[in-house]
A protein has these predicted regions:
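Glycine-rich FAD pyrophosphate-binding loop
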Residues: 37-51, 172-184
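A short, basic/flexible loop-to-alpha-helix module at the beginning of a structural domain
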Residues: 1-16, 133-147
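Conserved hydrophobic helix-helix packing surfaces used for dimerization/oligomerization
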Residues: 16, 39, 132, 149-150, ...
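A Rossmann-like FAD-binding core segment of flavoenzymes
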Residues: 65-111, 127-128, 134-140, 144-147, ...
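Glycine/Thr-rich phosphate-binding loops of Rossmann-like dinucleotide-binding domains
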Residues: 110-113, 118, 159-160, 184-185
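N-terminal Rossmann-like FAD-binding beta1-loop-alpha1 element of flavoenzymes
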Residues: 16-40, 160-168
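Beta1/beta-strand and adjacent pyrophosphate-binding region of the FAD-binding site
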Residues: 11-24, 145-157
């Protein structure tokens, strides 16, 4: 609704420390500053945006990074103190001296290979053999997959499908596995739905639907 983003000024402004510079942290910092609070935002990395910035590295998605640029301008206008490359542990947070602390550090991807579609397997058999990477690690170029890659598209959204598209455009031979009836199943209500699957097919990706990964050897997978 119009005016829904307007904030009433606080009658007793406080100092606030916000830890984490992803989109959630940026919005929390903006909202608090709009209400008149004195806000310091600490981000462990060298840039604001968190995982959202990685999403902007996927093909045809660079425009979403305009949101991060907008937040940076808003925080500057609202005089939010932004500290990059600033990791804060519990002791540092406790001694910072802020009236209020907001934690917006997000979460890390699981390292077990757990699949909701195969809930009886708490961990992917063979994951200790290595060469299993998160989408975040791939997009951040912290992981370097080989020529042939299996992508598990369990959530059916941009995280899996967009990362697969990036890998395919980089020349990798892809097999995309999903427990759903189609790749990117949760994107059916968006304009990207059909064009995404068509582009992946054009790039030679193989689709394996209504399936999961039963076992990983380090070089090959057993698919149900």
């Amino acid at each position: 609704a119009f005016g829904a983003d307007l904030f009433a000024q606080s009658k007793s402004p406080k100092s606030g420390l916000l830890v984490g510079g992803g989109v959630a942290g940026l919005e929390a910092a903006r909202a608090a500053a709009e209400m008149g609070h004195r806000v310091t935002l600490a981000e462990a990395g060298s840039q604001l945006g968190g995982a959202f910035r990685l999403a902007g590295l996927q093909p045809r998605r660079a425009q979403i990074l305009d949101l991060i640029d907008w937040y940076e301008r808003q925080l500057m206008k609202l005089q939010v103190e932004v500290k990059l490359n600033t990791y804060m542990d519990a002791a540092e947070i406790a001694t910072f001296g802020a009236d209020e602390v907001i934690m917006a550090t997000g979460s890390l991807p699981p390292e077990t290979g757990f699949q909701k579609a195969l809930a009886h397997l708490e961990e992917l058999p063979g994951i200790a053999n290595g060469n299993v990477f998160s989408a975040e690690a791939v997009m951040a170029r912290e992981a370097r997959p080989g020529k042939r890659v299996i992508v598990l598209d369990e959530a059916g959204n941009w995280k899996g499908a967009g990362t697969a598209w990036k890998l395919a455009e980089d020349g990798h031979e892809l097999t995309i596995v999903t427990p759903a009836a189609m790749i990117g199943s949760e994107m059916q209500r968006t304009a990207a739905d059909f064009p995404l699957r068509r582009r992946l097919a054009q790039l030679g990706a193989r689709f394996v639907t209504e399936s999961g990964i039963l076992e990983w050897s380090g070089k090959a997978a057993k698919i149900t």
